[in-house]
Amino acid sequence: MDAMQKTIEYTSVSRIAGPLMVIDGIEGVAYGEIVDITTPNGEKRTGQVLEAREEIAVVQVFEGTSELNTSETKVRFTGDTAKIGVSYDMLGRIFNGAGKPLDGGPEIIAEKKLDINGYPLNPVSRNPPNAFVQTGISTIDGTNTLVRGQKIPIFSGSGLPHNKLATQIARQAKVRGEGEQFAVVFAAMGITGEESNYFMDEFKKTGALEKAVVFINLADDPAIERILTPRIALTTAEYLAYEKGMHVLVILTDLTNYCEALREIAAARNEVPGRRGYPGYMYTDLACLYERAGRVKGREGTVTQIPILTMPDDDITHPIPDLTGYITEGQIVLSRELNRKGIYPPVDILPSLSRLAGNGQGEGKTRDDHSKVISQAYAAYAEGRGLRDLVAVVGEEALTERDRSFLKFADAFENSIVTQGVDEDRSIEETLDYVWDLLTILPREELKRVSDELIEKYLPKK
């Protein structure tokens, strides 16, 4: 679009439906372009082009289409895509889903204005995810180790404490090493006012806000803003990582609300629906978010992602968790059964997996015994869980002494490793020491996954 076209105001709005309006007789308009809208009473609004074909453009209005009409509404196409002004001063601030200050502070003086869609990374320019990120949560650090540049989702369900877990991770997460700079970018999408107050209060009262940038999109905010929020958050994270050399952890919650907004917009555009009514391009759209995690050659900083999503009806085969699993590098699954037992955080380590855990474990990263002792504990816990089903049928009296030790181990594992306080920040050394303590429950001859050298070095003497 040339400079002359940017000054043209169109009054050829032919149709308004829900949050969308259709403008006829336009030319040179591109998909994703930002639109300035003037209402009949002179109020200014903003929109974005969702579809451009021939001489027609379909525009989603961020603030909604109330008070707009087809005869007096004026539209100007800016020729620019959605951008956000970024600055190091964003740390310690809270913004709405569109990047406007929500904490009563001043507007940010931008050091740069960046396209919120990011820029495609050549796969050759990527470094593999590496180095340990400590969350202070034993079931993540120990069994599902998070590494810099990784993307690993948390699969939760309605009513499970994923919000509490998200704020605990944001508060406790850190990278180990002298002089390493670390920050958290937290983006909440489609949340209630109560949840918003909870997040803001937690960040403020715990001091976590000092090293964080927070974006809040409420359930009654426009659906198109919900689409922008994670992109704005990731653009901020990329700036802090690749321009300021920081290691950035991005926590996105709730991706289910994001996908519902995608479905809402697709329905308003009368698109042909895919699985369960979601648009056919949802996989591509999610990939555009998740693939912005990583490490770039020649850049000091990294972007690590923990997207959180609630599985409708606890169905892990639902399109949202299903497609997410194809793109990301594992998953952390919250269990309703563990939650009913009063266990927090209710992380079920058996279906959980970090495909890149090995990149962050071992001497110089965590500890030399990490992978072996966790493998031993995982196998013992899995056997103990299986024995619970057997006990339900034949009773505990029918078990051998060996079986009873594994059953006891499974209970102790849940009560001392999985369970931890909401304010309990465990180092990886503490987690591994707790695991070794539990292994004393098992007969020595059952410790087949750890070497004699490691047993001599770490196993407490009875």
Swiss-Prot record:
This is A-type ATP synthase subunit B. It is a peripheral membrane protein. One of its GO terms (biological process) is proton motive force-driven plasma membrane ATP synthesis. It comes from the Archaea. InterPro entries: ATP-synt_VA_C, ATPase_a/bsu_AS, ATPase_F1/V1/A1_a/bsu_N, ATPase_F1/V1/A1_a/bsu_nucl-bd, P-loop_NTPase, V-ATPase_su_B/beta. GO terms for molecular function: ATP binding; proton-transporting ATP synthase activity, rotational mechanism. Has multiple subunits with at least A(3), B(3), C, D, E, F, H, I and proteolipid K(x). Belongs to the ATPase alpha/beta chains family. The keyword Ribosomal protein does not apply. Its main location: membrane. It is found in: Cell membrane. The gene is atpB.
